[in-house]
């Protein structure tokens, strides 16, 4: 999404119960890719707003985008969110994912003159059938029952 934050800003988000920070690692047949994606999601009443979604281009199209999307949907359901929204800010490096929200079933709600676009997924409507083959491993810091 191209939004950049300082270390100080990230540290303040850690202590904010309206912000959810998640990271993802990928180990597959090609090897251990390590940390490959991070999310910053802001809770706004019954809306989850994907403020930042960064991902290493070396793992694109291996199903990780769909896996992370399914994690966002699980999170939204646990929090009883009615809407998931996201933004796309175009840059030289992220053209590969310019259609990601559309591919994941989000609807375009706003497009800015600078190319920024805003997307939403209504949790009350039938959700898109997105498949992936990624399996979650146990994580000591992930508790689906207690999202902040």
Question: What kind of feature is each model-predicted range?
Answer:
Residues 74-148:
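Terminal substrate-recognition subdomain of acyl/acetyltransferases
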Residues 60-74:
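Conserved acetyl-CoA-binding loop-helix of GNAT-fold acetyltransferases
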Residues 11-15, 70-77:
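Surface-exposed alpha-helical segments enriched in charged/polar residues
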Residues 1-58:
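A conserved beta-strand-loop-helix scaffold within acyl/acetyltransferase catalytic domains
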């Amino acid at each position: 999404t191209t939004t950049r934050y300082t270390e100080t800003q990230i540290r303040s988000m850690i202590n904010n119960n309206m912000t959810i920070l998640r990271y993802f690692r990928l180990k597959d047949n090609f090897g251990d890719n390590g940390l490959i994606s991070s999310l910053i999601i802001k809770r706004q009443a019954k809306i989850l707003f994907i403020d930042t979604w960064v991902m290493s281009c070396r793992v694109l199209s291996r199903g990780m985008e769909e896996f992370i999307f399914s994690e966002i949907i699980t999170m939204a359901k646990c929090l009883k969110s009615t809407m998931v929204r996201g933004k796309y800010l175009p840059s030289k490096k992220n053209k590969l994912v310019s259609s990601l929200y559309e591919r994941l079933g989000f609807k375009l709600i706003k497009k800015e003159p600078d190319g920024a676009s805003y997307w939403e997924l209504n949790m009350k409507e039938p959700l898109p059938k997105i498949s992936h083959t990624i399996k979650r491993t146990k994580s000591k810091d992930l508790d689906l029952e207690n999202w902040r």
